[in-house]
A protein has these predicted regions:
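Bacterial N-terminal signal peptides
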Residues: 7-17
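Residue-level detector of Asp-centered blade-edge/turn motifs that repeat once per structural unit
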Residues: 165-169, 216
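Short beta-strand->alpha-helix linker/helix-N-cap micro-motif
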Residues: 25-96, 109-113
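Structural motif
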Residues: 117-121, 181-190
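Amphipathic beta-strand/beta-sheet edge segments enriched in Tyr/Trp
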Residues: 22-26, 91-157
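Conserved beta-propeller blade repeats
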Residues: 161, 206-216
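Multi-bladed beta-propeller domains
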Residues: 193-210
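Residue position within the beta-strands of beta-propeller blades
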Residues: 110, 173-178
Length: 216
């Protein structure tokens, strides 16, 4: 018997953007992905560790999520960090545009990460390498546990700025998860980020679950 799993998708962060930085024709059949460099986040040396949180590793994780989000669209080609010439701390303040154009990048994302008074502060900037100027500056303050969502929100902002289309990375999916033997399947209602991470189960598996339902 064919199984049907119903998936609901809802966006938890909506932003309108009326213009694009770089025109990307998403209607063409054969699209060359836009080369984009996502520089590792610059971490203040005074904030390398905070209550067991390794800030440098956290910054790397945030950059990786942004890269993966861009790559998943097929519209962008995140360049390998091994090719980067400029250090993150210098690039975030004022990039040497010729260094980034040398590796064929057309857009550059830089960032800074620190923790102050128990709050995580993330700064990001988007640079147009052809026009040699900053086009977007973002700053978010949140709890350290919310870092993954902030990475998706930043991805949305940059995606919208580059394409003129609404981003969808800060989206969650509710679905029915199945496990156990074929004769005794256990069904649980679950929710996850659009990239498959941050899975949380909403039911224990002892209730009858057919499809997700929501109260208005």
């Amino acid at each position: 018997m064919k199984k049907i799993i119903l998936i609901f998708i809802f966006n938890v962060f909506l932003v309108n953007n009326s213009f694009a930085l770089i025109e990307i024709d998403i209607t063409r059949g054969n699209l060359d992905p836009l080369p984009i460099a996502v520089s590792p986040l610059h971490v203040d040396v005074k904030s390398e560790n905070y209550e067991g949180i390794k800030i440098k590793e956290l910054g790397e994780d945030i950059s990786k999520i942004i890269e993966d989000n861009f790559k998943s669209t097929g519209l962008f080609n995140p360049l390998k960090k091994e090719a980067f010439v400029q250090k993150p701390d210098i690039a975030h303040l004022k990039p040497r545009f010729e260094d980034w154009r040398l590796i064929k990048a057309q857009a550059l994302v830089t960032g800074k990460l620190l923790i102050t008074d128990g709050k995580l502060k993330i700064e990001f900037r988007l640079w147009d390498l052809a026009a040699t100027k900053e086009t977007t500056a973002l700053a978010f303050t949140t709890t350290p546990s919310n870092w993954r969502r902030v990475a998706h929100i930043i991805s949305d902002k940059i995606y919208e700025r580059l394409t003129g289309e609404e981003g969808y990375f800060d989206t969650r999916i509710i679905y029915v998860a199945e496990s156990g033997p074929k004769e005794q399947r256990i069904k649980k209602l679950a929710i996850m980020d659009q990239d498959g991470a941050n899975i949380k189960y909403l039911t224990l598996g002892n209730e009858l679950v057919l499809t997700p339902r929501f109260n208005p």
